[in-house]
Amino acid sequence: MFLLYEYDIFWAFLIISSAIPILAFLISGVLAPIRKGPEKLSSYESGIEPMGDAWLQFRIRYYMFALVFVVLDVETVFLYPWAMSFDVLGVPVFIEAFIFVLILIVGSVYAWRKGALEWS
């Protein structure tokens, strides 16, 4: 039989950490004033009136750089706990981490070859 009572703290943390943002959005939606006017429709750029059109389309390159950053950031999240417990885990986990890094290197080379990392 599973001992689910050992996870009571986890479930309490999960419920509380989910309830706080939901309550924040609900309270701000109820308390926020609803006024429609020309100021709501204008864009705000550091306290001054915008010069030209405020609605610009971003180039797809920004999204590609963001995607590569997220992939490398997730790689760091997975590799940091492994690096902290490297001496305890031993060689089999080292081989698994090596394969993980190898897959990420192959993906980075693929993105580089496809031109995802080119700025111009």
From Swiss-Prot:
HAMAP family assigned: NDH1_NuoA
EC assignment: 7.1.1.-
CC annotations in GO: chloroplast thylakoid membrane; NADH dehydrogenase complex
Segments traversing the membrane: 9-29, 64-84, 88-108
Similarity-based family: Belongs to the complex I subunit 3 family.
Function of the molecule: NDH shuttles electrons from NAD(P)H:plastoquinone, via FMN and iron-sulfur (Fe-S) centers, to quinones in the photosynthetic chain and possibly in a chloroplast respiratory chain. The immediate electron acceptor for the enzyme in this species is believed to be plastoquinone. Couples the redox reaction to proton translocation, and thus conserves the redox energy in a proton gradient.
Membrane topology: Multi-pass membrane protein
Biological process according to GO: photosynthesis, light reaction
PANTHER family: NADH-UBIQUINONE OXIDOREDUCTASE CHAIN 3
Assigned keywords, A-Z: Chloroplast, Membrane, NAD, NADP, Plastid, Plastoquinone, Quinone, Thylakoid, Translocase, Transmembrane, Transmembrane helix, Transport
GO molecular function: NADH dehydrogenase (ubiquinone) activity; quinone binding
Catalytic activity: a plastoquinone + NADH + (n+1) H(+)(in) = a plastoquinol + NAD(+) + n H(+)(out); a plastoquinone + NADPH + (n+1) H(+)(in) = a plastoquinol + NADP(+) + n H(+)(out)
UniProt keyword Membrane present: yes
Record flagged with keyword DNA-binding: no
Main location, first listed in the record: plastid
Pfam families: Oxidored_q4
Record-given protein name: NAD(P)H-quinone oxidoreductase subunit 3, chloroplastic
Organism in which the protein naturally occurs: Gossypium barbadense (Sea Island cotton)
